[in-house]
Curated annotation (Swiss-Prot):
It catalyses: a ubiquinone + NADH + 5 H(+)(in) = a ubiquinol + NAD(+) + 4 H(+)(out). This is NADH-ubiquinone oxidoreductase chain 2. It is found in: Mitochondrion inner membrane. GO terms for molecular function: NADH dehydrogenase (ubiquinone) activity. The keyword S-adenosyl-L-methionine does not apply. It comes from Scyliorhinus canicula. The gene is MT-ND2.
């Protein structure tokens, strides 16, 4: 892609997200979401592959539907209350419609149908943007609306997402689909606690973005899109295969890694709110997610790709060294659990 065009596209994505962050008027926020959506479409379609075209079409239709529903919710709220301010959504029907629209935008179950198929049709770089950056603007709105939203509806979306994310990833062999269901499950954890502790949602979102960034960068380095293609990662770089192992276990929420921290704090908060049954269901579904992460760990570090030479490494193998971005994100994804007391102190 032309560097000038790429610069304009990336600047537009940044502008759209910034507008949503700073906006307090519904139309300005909606405009930011639309700029964000339209900016990523050229990146999705640049491959000129039928699967990329299909993924882009699905993404555009889904996001357009969600944007129309969100605009309808804001107009309805302005009609009934006379307020266009983001934090003045006093009409319960408008708040419910806005929640459903934002759930469709980020891919919460049962409105998740588009996310695995779209992510599967994209290359890993664009998939990384879709799984991380494109979540920021909708979550900025959700965090501002959190006191006004229906807690039961958020709980329904959250628990359903953890169930779908856990079960959906079990029989997948495509890495991008596994990461899509992983995203759905993690979004479920975030949205469940949104009404009770927005700061925990923000903490979970930040850690999720770092862990997803590390995972996508590793798969891009290994040039892997299927489970059976990452078995040669140990030959390419033993250090990076160990980083992949630790990051995947952290995504699964295994102690003593960073990914355990938000799950632990969220379950603790749900228990304080006497939501024992949702907390139990989510903890059990986390075990299902951990199972398919363990499958990836087994394929990454405990299997060896078939080859004609019985050697640890061949002269043809290109040496892969982790970059500074990868090392930084991996460190945050793996070693943040001892910082929990400090983070809790900053949050209170």
């Amino acid at each position: 892609m032309n560097p000038t065009v790429l610069t304009i596209i990336i600047s537009s994505m940044g502008l759209g997200t910034t507008l949503t962050f700073i906006g307090s008027h519904w139309l300005l926020v909606w405009m930011g979401l639309e700029i964000n959506t339209l900016a990523i479409i050229p990146l999705m379609i640049r491959q000129h592959h039928p699967r990329a075209v299909e993924a882009t079409t699905k993404y555009f239709i889904t996001q357009a539907t969600a944007s129309a529903l969100l605009l309808f919710a804001s107009v309805t709220n302005a009609w009934t209350s006379g307020e266009w301010s983001l934090i003045e959504m006093l009409n319960p029907t408008s708040a419910t419609l806005a929640t459903a629209a934002l759930a469709l935008k980020i891919g919460l179950a049962p409105l998740h149908f588009w996310l695995p198929e779209v992510l599967q049709g994209l290359d890993l770089t664009t998939g990384l943007i879709l799984a991380t950056w494109q979540k920021l603007a909708p979550f900025a709105i959700l965090l501002q609306l959190s006191p006004l939203l229906n807690s039961n509806l958020l709980l329904l979306f959250g628990v359903t997402s953890t169930i779908v994310g856990g079960w959906g990833g079990l029989n997948q062999t495509q890495l991008r689909k596994i990461l899509a269901y992983s995203s759905i499950a993690n979004l479920g954890w975030m949205i469940t606690i949104l009404h009770y502790s927005p700061s925990l949602t923000l903490l979970n979102l930040i850690l999720y973005m770092f862990m997803t960034l590390t995972t996508f960068l590793l798969f891009k380095t290994f040039n892997s899109t299927k489970i059976n293609s990452i078995s040669s990662s140990t030959l390419k770089s033993p250090l990076m295969s160990v980083i992949a192992l630790m990051t995947l276990l952290s995504l699964g929420g295994l102690p003593p890694l960073s990914g355990f921290m938000p799950k632990w704090l969220i379950l603790q908060e749900l228990t304080k709110q006497s939501l024992i049954i949702p907390a139990t269901i989510m903890a059990l579904m986390a075990l299902l997610s951990l199972f398919f992460y363990l499958r990836l760990c087994y394929a990454t570090t405990l299997t060896k790709a078939p080859g004609p030479i019985n050697m640890a490494s061949t002269w043809r193998t290109k040496s892969h060294q982790p970059t500074l971005i990868l090392l930084t994100s991996a460190s945050i994804s793996i070693f943040m659990l001892p910082m929990t007391p400090l983070i809790l102190m900053l949050m209170t």
